[in-house]
């Protein structure tokens, strides 16, 4: 876990329970004598998220409707800290902060977690985009409960399912960074199979096919969890569409959960003729994932960008700064025929 992650040492359940009486009701003592919750219980996971967002990030009244993704907060915070380090590589090892740093969140969701964390940690401003109008309405209600966010978090509907960047930006809009947690699965059946497997691993087998659907403990459905072609197809489409706005975002980034997708993504980046691409490894416990980042701006353009946009912005040096990024491996060779 990232060293600046507020949960890097684990959940402080005593402090979180003091923040939220609703969470306190779900906290149990394990056989090992430690505090925990039932992570297979969606209500408990939601209360944990609400308490974390209030205790660590000052977010009041966070909530999501039934059926929407309830993401693990530490993993989302790792993404934000990792891209902050990425920006620092272009800013003399200082993380640019404040609302002048503009971040485009593709698929902001009903939970709006990335803007909440990014604004609290670094003061960044966000444009959150989604195809789901109900999700955007819930995100707007979170802003309504936290009016101090209204000037720094904007929400926008993307009405065309296959469009990611296409038709999205308005005249003159530029962003220092784009972020995305792409749909992971290829189909609803794929979602169901993974959900069933998770429940089986928890010794909670769930319902058989044809009965009530077993649920992922983090919820979610529809555009949040699946698209045709899954994660690989979505990220490839993002890369293709980024070619049409190459200098309006300095660093494009996306989470990439499946390591075997990397050769296909490398091939797409090569085809797009990006100036530079990197992978940024991330790990939470036994879970291994990574970010893929790419830019169409050369070193000189990035230095000009820094001078024009960040020199007047507050920033701070990254403690014991060490780049955890690396170019996509040149020796990785994609299959001859890409099935997606």
From Swiss-Prot:
Keyword rRNA processing on entry:
yes
A Pfam family this protein belongs to? Methyltransf_10
Compartments annotated for it: namely:
Cytoplasm
Entry keyword set: Cytoplasm, Methyltransferase, rRNA processing, S-adenosyl-L-methionine, Transferase
Looking up InterPro entries in the UniProt record yields:
METTL16/RlmF, rRNA_lsu_MeTfrase_F, SAM-dependent_MTases_sf
Q: Which reaction does it catalyse?
A: adenosine(1618) in 23S rRNA + S-adenosyl-L-methionine = N(6)-methyladenosine(1618) in 23S rRNA + S-adenosyl-L-homocysteine + H(+)
Q: Which residues form a coiled coil?
A: none
Query: SUPFAM superfamilies attached here?
Result: S-adenosyl-L-methionine-dependent methyltransferases
Q: Name one GO biological process term.
A: rRNA base methylation
The Swiss-Prot or TrEMBL record annotates one GO molecular function as: 23S rRNA (adenine(1618)-N(6))-methyltransferase activity
What is the protein name stated in its UniProt record? Ribosomal RNA large subunit methyltransferase F
């Amino acid at each position: 876990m990232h060293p600046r992650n507020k949960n890097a040492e684990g959940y402080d359940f005593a402090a979180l329970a003091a923040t939220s009486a609703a969470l306190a009701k779900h906290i149990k003592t394990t056989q090992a004598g430690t505090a925990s919750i039932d992570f297979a219980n969606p209500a408990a996971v939601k209360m944990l998220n609400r308490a974390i967002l209030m205790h660590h990030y000052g977010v009041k009244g966070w909530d999501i409707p039934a059926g929407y993704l309830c993401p693990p907060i530490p993993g989302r915070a790792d993404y934000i800290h990792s891209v902050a380090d990425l920006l620092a590589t272009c800013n003399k090892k200082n993380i640019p902060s404040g609302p002048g740093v503009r971040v485009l969140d593709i698929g902001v969701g009903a939970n709006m977690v990335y803007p909440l964390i990014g604004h609290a940690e670094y003061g960044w401003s966000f444009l959150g985009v989604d195809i789901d109008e109900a999700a955007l309405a819930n995100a707007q209600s979170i802003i309504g409960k936290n009016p101090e966010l209204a000037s720094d978090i904007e929400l926008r509907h993307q009405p065309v399912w296959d469009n990611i960047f296409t038709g999205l930006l308005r005249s003159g809009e530029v962003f220092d960074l784009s972020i995305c947690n792409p749909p992971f699965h290829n189909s609803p059946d794929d979602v169901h199979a993974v959900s069933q497997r998770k429940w089986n691993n928890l010794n909670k087998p769930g319902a058989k096919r044809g009965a009530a659907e077993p649920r992922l403990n983090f919820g979610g459905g529809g555009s949040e969890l699946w698209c045709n072609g899954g994660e690989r197809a979505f990220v490839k489409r993002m890369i293709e569409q980024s070619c049409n706005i190459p200098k309006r975002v300095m660093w494009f980034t996306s989470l990439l959960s499946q390591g075997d997708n990397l050769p296909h993504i490398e091939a797409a980046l090569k085809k797009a003729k990006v100036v530079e691409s990197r992978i940024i490894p991330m790990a939470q416990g036994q879970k291994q994932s990574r970010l893929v980042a790419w830019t169409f701006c050369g070193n000189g353009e990035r230095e000009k960008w820094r001078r024009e946009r960040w020199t007047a912005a507050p920033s701070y040096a990254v403690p014991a700064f060490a780049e955890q990024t690396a170019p996509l491996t040149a020796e990785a060779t994609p299959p001859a025929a890409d099935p997606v």
